[in-house]
Amino acid sequence: MTETVAIIVAGGRGQRAGAERPKQWQMLLGKRVIDWSIAAFVDHPQISQVVIVAGDELGDCSAEPKIIQAKPGNTRTQSVLSGLAAATISEDATVVIHDAARPGIDAATISSLIARLQDPSVSGAAPAMPVADALKTNSGQSWTNVDRTGLVRVQTPQAFRLGEIRAALSAAGPDLVDDLTAIEAAGGRVEIVSGSARLTKITYPEDFDMLARLLSPTGAPRIGKGYDVHEFEAGDHVTLCGVAIPHIAKLKGHSDADAAWHALTDAILGAVALGDIGDHFPPSDPQWKGADSGLFLKEAQRLAEAKGYVIANCDITVICEAPKVKPHREAMRARTAELLGLPLDAVSVKATTTEGLGFTGRREGIAAEAVALLMPKG
């Protein structure tokens, strides 16, 4: 069978989606929009390479041998050509080009497109859906109905042969609608396969909600809440979210007494009804003496994933008069996100006081609360 490479184009600005960050880097059901497409192509048995055309926002993908990164161009066509140049395949190999802003790609659509390119008379294939809404055009003076007969909404991914699509795009003008148009302009025969609402391109803010409903796996999200308290004892720092914060005392506990991570561990365990931190790491067990609370947090994550749930986001609140948490807040967020493998914007850390009331007001210790949202694995 002919070798097939996927090219994911992720260089767009996505300004109409209504956020400061381009849509492909925003979160959808617990992971970045682009990660949905990456997973679909990496996991497909007929895809030998996945070329991702993106800037530094992509991050390190070196652990996945299928992935190659290419730099984006100034236009979409230039970005696609950059991806084609990075692919290490023959001229007659199949390429499947996909917009990163369409997270609903599925294995069946990929397979259908690849199958169409096995016919040597077919130069391009794409999914499309019939136009369901009434259409009108404005002549400048009045609105006129447009006949919908034969009209479709073309989506991605779109499949071609490497040599043909490279030549077609190189010859295309600046007003190219999509890659399929370039093949048609070059005289190639194209075929349409059945599209899906799941393949809708994220363009406007409301598209996120619509696709979240379509892509949500079976099962409801889970929410857990955790709370922890530790008193002060003689020492020179406290540990919160794995970050050592200088102080005139330390927190007393069997482990490292990281109240913030203990609360988050309980929140994760509670979300999947697996008891609390004391059930899994009892203070009576000497093996946990002085232990790094990151071990507890990672084990809670592992147990949740074993039950079919992944962490979508978490929110931690530290309650104390001292030390001042705000100067260390970003480091605490970063350390938690790194440990759990979450995007930074999926982790919130806040701090507050009790206005001098209670044991925290008397500076006798620190309390922490955490809330975690877990989603069924997609």
UniProtKB/Swiss-Prot annotation:
Query: Residues annotated as region 2-C-methyl-D-erythritol 2,4-cyclodiphosphate synthase?
Result: 222-378
> Under which name does UniProt file this protein?
Bifunctional enzyme IspD/IspF
Site for Transition state stabilizer, residues: R16, K23, H254, T353
State its Enzyme Commission number(s): 2.7.7.60, 4.6.1.12
Q: Which SUPFAM superfamilies match?
A: IpsF-like, Nucleotide-diphospho-sugar transferases
Origin, by domain of life?
Answer: Bacteria
Q: Which cofactors are reported in the record for this sequence?
A: a divalent metal cation
Q: Which residues bind a divalent metal cation?
A: D228, H230, H262
Organism from which the protein derives: Hyphomonas neptunium (strain ATCC 15444)
